[in-house]
Amino acid sequence: MGAILGKKIGMTRLYNEKREAVPCTIIQAGPCFVTQVKSAGIDGYDAYQVGIGERKEAKVTKPMLGHYKKAGVAPGYMTAEFDTSMFDGELTAGSPVLVESFTEGEIVKVQGVSKGKGFAGVVKRHNFGGGQRTHGQSDRLRAPGSIGGASDPSKTFKGTKMGGRMGSDTITVRNLQVIKIMPESSLIMVKGSVPGPKNSYVRIVSTKK
């Protein structure tokens, strides 16, 4: 079992024993440190708050700078909370979180923010088919069509699929296999793709299966 934060570096391929090309995502999982220990008695639940990376103090707000100094670690780029059951042993503020907590072949889930694509129509955003391409049609090729009734129900229902901002959603990809771990450089390689662009931050958590 393990949990850690990481930065998506990019994708590559590795070859397995059958000489098959396996697409992999390279994630820089560290340096990570525990920035706060939350307990049920004080906070209402048990969790470890983990930070990643080292940032200039001038780039961090004063409240967050004091938060990091209290833990005795350098300011990071982001923090996230993980359940204490995801870690072996008891950790304290300032404890390092290492990529060695994972094993090769293990199944993990990765959570990140997907690429933002801006305003998109219904064809791109919701896979609508659009209007027919014949019989005098001129401007309905990618139109959404009807969005509601007339006098009944006299409204458009919430959740109706329309054009709008696409992407920038929190996405969790499950059942990804850990292909390779490189502790000396804090790298972890998982089979397949993970959400987000290059240099975006992701959460990696072992599955309980």
From Swiss-Prot:
Query: A Gene Ontology CC term for this entry?
Result: cytosolic large ribosomal subunit
Keywords of the record, alphabetical order, are: Ribonucleoprotein, Ribosomal protein, RNA-binding, rRNA-binding
Q: Does this entry carry the keyword RNA-binding?
A: yes
Lineage, opening ranks: Bacteria, Pseudomonadati, Chlorobiota, Chlorobiia, Chlorobiales
GO molecular function list: rRNA binding; structural constituent of ribosome
Query: Superkingdom of this entry's organism?
Result: Bacteria
Tell me how this protein assembles: Part of the 50S ribosomal subunit. Forms a cluster with proteins L14 and L19.
- Sum up the protein's function in the record's words: One of the primary rRNA binding proteins, it binds directly near the 3'-end of the 23S rRNA, where it nucleates assembly of the 50S subunit.
Task: Locate the transmembrane regions by residue number.
Answer: none
Q: Give the family this protein belongs to, as stated in its UniProt record.
A: Belongs to the universal ribosomal protein uL3 family.
- Provide the residue span(s) of the region labelled Disordered: 127-166
PANTHER family xrefs:
50S RIBOSOMAL PROTEIN L3, LARGE RIBOSOMAL SUBUNIT PROTEIN UL3C
> Could you tell me which Gene3D superfamilies the record lists for this protein?
3.30.160.810, Translation factors
Give the gene that encodes this protein.
rplC
Which species expresses this protein natively?
Chlorobium phaeovibrioides (strain DSM 265 / 1930)
**Which InterPro entries does this chain map to?**
Ribosomal_uL3, Ribosomal_uL3_bac/org-type, Transl_B-barrel_sf
Q: Which protein are we looking at?
A: Large ribosomal subunit protein uL3
Q: Quote the Pfam families the UniProt record gives.
A: Ribosomal_L3 (PF00297)
